[in-house]
């Protein structure tokens, strides 16, 4: 697994032993300072503000939420599909898919998570992303009417499947390279890095208390299995960041469909024909209903 999915580890010492010793001592001797340092280190994404070539007609709009001002990107006319990127990503990754959606007679709206792209903020984590997403859904629904569906990439899948807005469970959902076994993989990655699990757990507990969102309730696979809306996963078998095996597990619910690819990796798949075709299937099914 990679920091590309969950949090920033680029500044970690190459020595796991020294890192573990240092963070444990820091937490013992100065717990408050250690937690602040850990929060800044672990929860600061790699901000990507390179949008690439914006499609003609793209409208940028700031949206104010309790988690700061988020930058949204709108393209097309018609019923709205909402798109969400993953950790250290940006809405610009969706430009090719947004163009395809707009060409099919829909409005595509993507946005930058807090502390990502052109949105405000310096740190991010799943409960913050969920709160911002839920508020954005409320605002988009009030302005444009009911959403037609949701598209999420990478950690965005875990965010979508942790939303407090249960009405989304009835909507079509396109998951691209999703992170589905979020909490075990998150803690496993911290352990493999050598960072103090006790210190990381202290940071997590503060976030849980602030947002009233215990990680014990985060279960993307379980939430996916309980949805009534059609869900399609597009996932590369050689994805180095999000396990393809978890997407295979997701199909055991008998309703979730999986489109497996090879050679598209974790990011290129966003602009691929299989992703476009999966959207076409979902939108056609939505129209038929």
Regions found by a protein language model. Give the residues of each.
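Hydrolase active-site cap/lid region
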Residues: 165-211
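Gly/Ala-rich beta-loop-alpha elbow adjacent to hydrolase catalytic centers
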Residues: 151-160
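Short beta-strand/loop motif that positions the catalytic acidic residue
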Residues: 224-227, 232-235, 239
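Conserved alpha/beta-hydrolase "acid-adjacent" motif
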Residues: 240-246
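An N-terminal hydrophobic leader/cap segment in hydrolases
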Residues: 3-62
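Conserved alpha/beta-hydrolase
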Residues: 91, 98-120
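Catalytic histidine-centered segment of alpha/beta-hydrolase-like enzymes
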Residues: 264-274
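Alpha/beta-hydrolase active-site loop
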Residues: 123-143, 148
């Amino acid at each position: 697994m990679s920091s590309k999915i969950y949090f920033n580890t680029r500044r970690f010492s190459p020595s796991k032993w020294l890192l573990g010793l240092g963070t444990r001592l820091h937490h013992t001797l100065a717990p408050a300072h250690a937690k602040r340092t850990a929060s800044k280190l672990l929860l600061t994404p790699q901000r990507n503000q390179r949008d690439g070539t914006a499609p003609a007609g793209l409208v940028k709009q700031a949206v104010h939420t309790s988690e700061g001002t988020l930058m949204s990107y709108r393209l097309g006319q018609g019923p709205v599909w909402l798109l969400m990127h993953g950790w250290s990503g940006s809405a610009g990754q969706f430009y090719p898919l947004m163009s395809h959606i707009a060409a099919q007679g829909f409005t595509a709206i993507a946005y930058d998570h807090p502390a990502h792209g052109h949105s405000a903020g310096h740190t991010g984590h799943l409960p913050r992303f969920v709160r911002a997403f839920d508020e954005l859904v409320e605002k988009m629904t009030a302005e444009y009417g009911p959403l037609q569906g949701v598209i999420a990439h990478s950690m965005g899948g875990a965010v979508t499947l942790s939303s407090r807005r249960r009405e989304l469970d009835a909507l079509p959902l396109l998951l691209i390279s999703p992170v589905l076994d979020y909490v075990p993989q998150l803690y496993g990655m911290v352990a493999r890095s050598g960072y103090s699990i006790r210190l990381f757990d202290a940071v997590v507990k503060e976030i849980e208390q602030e947002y009233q969102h215990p990680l014990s309730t985060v279960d993307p696979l379980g939430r996916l299995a309980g949805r009534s809306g059609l869900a399609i996963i597009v996932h590369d078998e050689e994805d180095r960041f999000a396990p393809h095996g978890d997407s295979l597990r997701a199909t055991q619910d008998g309703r979730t469909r999986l489109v497996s690819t090879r050679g598209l990796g974790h990011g290129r798949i966003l602009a691929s024909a299989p992703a476009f075709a999966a959207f076409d299937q979902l939108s056609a099914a939505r129209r038929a209903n």
